[in-house]
């Protein structure tokens, strides 16, 4: 059976044992298939914790999480066969792919090993067409040796490894920070194409907003473990070419219809900056800027 939503979360609260306050508080989400969701928030807002819960890396004890209709912590979610695929096809997909900060520090990236050898060890020959596409998109030379690469080059190889096997739900946590502008733009365009051509969805937490103006379907703002803003990109976000009384600086909030107006730029950076300033509650003038 094909689930109605890629991700469904009900009344999710999570607290680390060593913490007195929960990191995630009463989260409710319904993320449809074929969508791209952007998660915005200051450090410590709960973004990484939420993504780890969605991936099954933390056990949910208070609330309910369904990814592709199943609990991500359940072993059943690894071998699910949906109505729109055969058993053979299902082996070519994994329900959830999580690429986060600890994944970026895997020890193998510093070994003296060839890139092609590394890719072949995780199924490059089986997913050759997809692998070759990722190599082109990320501008990877398969003759590279991993221990000789820059941080940015290593990150590109890691992303090719992480994205090689197709996924139903992709969870990205700050993994594009080392990419140059071109590699990042190509990667985002590839992920957009993926969500438009097959049944899958992406949730992306980041502090880098340039080039994202036309990318997401939903924008979620997290503060103190809660989702405090949830914007439908088509309905709630407007880019204005005229900076007038309606737009105070670069962003204006219309309280009557929950709409956000942003001065005409190809970036969600002004909105993210305004949200984080409000979260911080310290006016710029008080810190001398």
UniProtKB/Swiss-Prot annotation:
Compartmental location: Cytoplasm; Nucleus
UniProt entry tagged with the keyword Kinase: no
Chief location: cytoplasm
Alphabetized Pfam families for the sequence: ABC_tran (PF00005)
SUPFAM superfamilies xref list: P-loop containing nucleoside triphosphate hydrolases
Oligomer status and interactors: Interacts with CCR4 and SSN2.
Name of this chain's protein: CCR4-associated factor 16
